Amino acid sequence: MKRSAINEILGHTRQFFSQHDVHLPPFASFPPTQWRKLDAAAWSEVFDLKLGWDVTAFGGNNFAAQGLTLFTLRNGSPKGMPYEKCYAEKIMHVRDAQVTPMHFHWRKREDIINRGGGNLIVEL
Protein backbone atom coordinates (compact mmCIF):
# COMPACT_ATOMS: atom_id res chain seq x y z
CA MET A 1 0.00 0.00 0.00
CA LYS A 2 1.33 3.45 -0.85
CA ARG A 3 1.98 5.96 1.93
CA SER A 4 -0.54 8.36 0.38
CA ALA A 5 -3.25 5.67 0.62
CA ILE A 6 -2.31 4.93 4.24
CA ASN A 7 -2.46 8.63 5.11
CA GLU A 8 -5.90 8.91 3.51
CA ILE A 9 -7.14 5.85 5.43
CA LEU A 10 -5.76 7.23 8.72
CA GLY A 11 -7.39 10.60 8.07
CA HIS A 12 -10.75 8.93 7.45
CA THR A 13 -10.35 6.81 10.59
CA ARG A 14 -9.41 9.81 12.74
CA GLN A 15 -12.53 11.59 11.51
CA PHE A 16 -14.67 8.52 12.25
CA PHE A 17 -13.19 8.23 15.76
CA SER A 18 -13.85 11.90 16.40
CA GLN A 19 -17.50 11.55 15.31
CA HIS A 20 -17.92 8.68 17.78
CA ASP A 21 -16.14 10.41 20.67
CA VAL A 22 -13.14 8.07 20.62
CA HIS A 23 -10.12 9.81 22.11
CA LEU A 24 -6.58 8.60 21.43
CA PRO A 25 -3.40 9.35 23.36
CA PRO A 26 -1.21 12.23 22.15
CA PHE A 27 1.30 9.89 20.46
CA ALA A 28 -1.43 8.92 17.96
CA SER A 29 -0.73 12.22 16.20
CA PHE A 30 3.05 12.47 16.54
CA PRO A 31 4.72 13.33 13.22
CA PRO A 32 7.88 11.39 12.26
CA THR A 33 10.07 14.29 13.43
CA GLN A 34 8.67 14.01 16.95
CA TRP A 35 9.17 10.22 17.04
CA ARG A 36 12.83 10.67 16.11
CA LYS A 37 13.37 13.06 19.05
CA LEU A 38 11.91 10.74 21.70
CA ASP A 39 13.98 9.05 24.38
CA ALA A 40 13.58 5.41 23.29
CA ALA A 41 14.05 4.08 26.84
CA ALA A 42 11.24 6.27 28.18
CA TRP A 43 8.94 5.04 25.41
CA SER A 44 10.06 1.39 25.44
CA GLU A 45 6.61 -0.03 26.25
CA VAL A 46 5.13 1.71 23.20
CA PHE A 47 7.85 0.25 20.96
CA ASP A 48 8.10 -3.19 22.61
CA LEU A 49 4.35 -3.85 22.50
CA LYS A 50 3.82 -2.21 19.12
CA LEU A 51 1.29 0.31 20.39
CA GLY A 52 -0.13 2.71 17.84
CA TRP A 53 -1.57 2.56 14.35
CA ASP A 54 -2.01 -0.46 12.09
CA VAL A 55 -3.47 -0.38 8.59
CA THR A 56 -3.69 -3.78 6.95
CA ALA A 57 -5.16 -5.53 3.95
CA PHE A 58 -4.12 -8.87 5.53
CA GLY A 59 -1.57 -9.60 2.82
CA GLY A 60 -4.00 -8.91 -0.01
CA ASN A 61 -4.27 -5.94 -2.30
CA ASN A 62 -7.92 -4.93 -1.78
CA PHE A 63 -8.16 -2.96 1.47
CA ALA A 64 -11.76 -1.90 0.71
CA ALA A 65 -12.90 -5.55 0.62
CA GLN A 66 -10.65 -7.11 3.27
CA GLY A 67 -8.92 -4.72 5.60
CA LEU A 68 -8.77 -3.12 9.01
CA THR A 69 -7.52 0.06 10.62
CA LEU A 70 -6.77 -0.07 14.31
CA PHE A 71 -5.01 1.74 17.10
CA THR A 72 -3.48 -0.42 19.84
CA LEU A 73 -3.74 1.30 23.24
CA ARG A 74 -2.61 -1.61 25.42
CA ASN A 75 -1.11 -4.96 24.57
CA GLY A 76 0.21 -7.94 26.45
CA SER A 77 3.70 -9.24 25.88
CA PRO A 78 4.47 -12.87 25.04
CA LYS A 79 4.39 -15.03 28.19
CA GLY A 80 3.71 -11.90 30.24
CA MET A 81 7.30 -10.68 30.30
CA PRO A 82 8.29 -7.95 30.86
CA TYR A 83 4.80 -6.39 30.72
CA GLU A 84 2.32 -8.48 32.67
CA LYS A 85 -0.94 -8.08 30.77
CA CYS A 86 -3.12 -10.85 29.39
CA TYR A 87 -5.32 -8.55 27.35
CA ALA A 88 -5.24 -6.11 24.50
CA GLU A 89 -7.16 -2.88 24.05
CA LYS A 90 -7.53 -1.93 20.42
CA ILE A 91 -9.80 0.60 18.80
CA MET A 92 -10.77 -0.77 15.39
CA HIS A 93 -12.36 0.80 12.36
CA VAL A 94 -13.95 -1.56 9.86
CA ARG A 95 -15.63 0.11 6.90
CA ASP A 96 -18.98 -0.83 5.35
CA ALA A 97 -18.79 -4.19 3.55
CA GLN A 98 -15.19 -4.71 4.74
CA VAL A 99 -14.30 -8.17 6.08
CA THR A 100 -11.60 -9.07 8.60
CA PRO A 101 -10.31 -12.67 8.65
CA MET A 102 -10.93 -14.89 11.65
CA HIS A 103 -8.14 -15.23 14.20
CA PHE A 104 -7.56 -16.13 17.82
CA HIS A 105 -4.98 -15.77 20.58
CA TRP A 106 -3.88 -18.58 22.88
CA ARG A 107 -2.94 -16.26 25.74
CA LYS A 108 -4.75 -13.00 25.24
CA ARG A 109 -8.23 -11.74 26.04
CA GLU A 110 -10.15 -9.28 23.92
CA ASP A 111 -13.45 -7.52 24.53
CA ILE A 112 -15.35 -6.40 21.46
CA ILE A 113 -17.45 -3.27 21.90
CA ASN A 114 -19.30 -1.86 18.91
CA ARG A 115 -19.33 1.91 19.37
CA GLY A 116 -19.89 2.90 15.77
CA GLY A 117 -23.44 1.62 15.42
CA GLY A 118 -22.83 -0.71 12.48
CA ASN A 119 -23.69 -4.39 12.29
CA LEU A 120 -21.02 -6.56 13.90
CA ILE A 121 -21.14 -10.15 12.69
CA VAL A 122 -19.01 -12.62 14.65
CA GLU A 123 -18.56 -16.26 13.69
CA LEU A 124 -17.69 -18.60 16.58
Regions found by a protein language model. Give the residues of each.
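Glycine- and acidic-residue-biased ligand/ion/polar-headgroup-sensing regions
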Residues: 95-96, 108-110, 114-124
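Conserved hydrophobic/aromatic beta-strand scaffold that supports enzyme active sites
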Residues: 70, 91-93, 111
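Structural recognition of beta-strand segments within beta-rich domains
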Residues: 84, 92-95
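Short glycine/proline-enriched turns and hinge-like loops at secondary-structure junctions
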Residues: 84-86, 105-106, 114
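Short secondary-structure capping micro-motifs at structural edges
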Residues: 76-78, 97-110
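A short, N-terminal "cap"/entry segment at the start of jelly-roll beta-barrel domains
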Residues: 1-88, 101
